[in-house]
């Protein structure tokens, strides 16, 4: 069963599964019913500027929170509608099946390289629901499930551009399916149907394909699950192995083979100067980084040649958001495990790693994330490639910090921990404290994608000892303002407790600064969203970028104090 939330929304109602919340059905249904009844009152009483003002700092995830685009491959291409102008296009799978990975369509989002806080939905680029003859595959017209894709651009001698999409079709006879378009935003049409069978395609690429066109026009493909494969492709087909060459097996050592590489999946390839950089999902060793084994990381290796040999480089991003607790022990400060997939991209001279995170309590509602990184290349044979590890934050492209005077969804939290560590048993995570609940948009979600009434995820299960954090807000925007308060919108859950607002660290012993606090009472209406006003005497004089934390305290253990909806400094 699914419930549709109406709180604070106009055209959008995110869907949250009962199984993704640590709550009783009766309690949840009462909150939902009351929240939906309150829609008219909330919308009318809310200040217009709070609801509709365009965010200058969107946060992380950088796409709207109702959209789920994991496995993102970022590319800078020319805008076909504005020649000479560049846009960043992100191609990923589409988590809309809810109870399993990905979806039966692929869509693309893009943003001007000059305005990375305004992402635009460019529409569906591919659905594979008909064969070469235009016939449905079955009587129901069911489309194929499409996993993590890649895109590459081929420009001919006359300057004509063809974009090739490798959609990672999960139907056995169509694993190697590819499609092409004259535009980066599609639509794409399948171009490698078999001449012998209208339901099959000709092609060697399999799980998680990545394709690269080198400066000399030669084409290379990469793929694999737990073992890595690569091949030089025939440029006339873009799908089959070049005659006279062979598939390279175990291009780098896999998860169960010796060495530090530990390839799992998520092949991606880039060329930076004269070096080839292979990005992939790596299965860490048990105890590595002080945490259990996980494939929730992206790593890289590099070579002087597109097919190797390769030198291991290191970790680019860790989706567990490694931090240290009050005693100095390494912890996962976000979802403890899952998968991730992405790549790196240079935009206006700055490098970023694009990846995804998990939301809810399973791996089927993933969101697009980004972090700045540093890339250094030593040119020449045997030269090194050094890529710094990105930090898991709430900033996204707001590298100077989030604007505290804009209302942000609680769902951009980058730190959510409980009184004891969350656990993972594929494909589910069990949380003993705070986590970001997943939500999905409806057909009207594009009207105002970043409007707070559309763009929100709740943070739920805020039990005693839970911590919810945001890195980072830039408090310089509050300079000169007196009596600054925090307006925090919540749904109380019928127990007494306190929310402590802190900066820099959630622990005073680790130089955390207490900004303010407020009590949540058991007699507060549990069926109504309310806004708390929290005085912040400790904020005086605070400038620059600082992490913000909500620490939950209650004498009632193992029960959630409230849901967090959104907040703004006033």
Q: Model regions: which residues?
A:
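Short, intrinsically disordered, low-complexity terminal segments
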Residues: 10, 30-32, 45-48
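Short hotspots in intrinsically disordered terminal tails
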Residues: 19-20, 567
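Bacterial N-terminal signal peptides that target proteins for export
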Residues: 21-31
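Carbohydrate-active catalytic/glycan-binding domains of CAZyme proteins
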Residues: 46-570
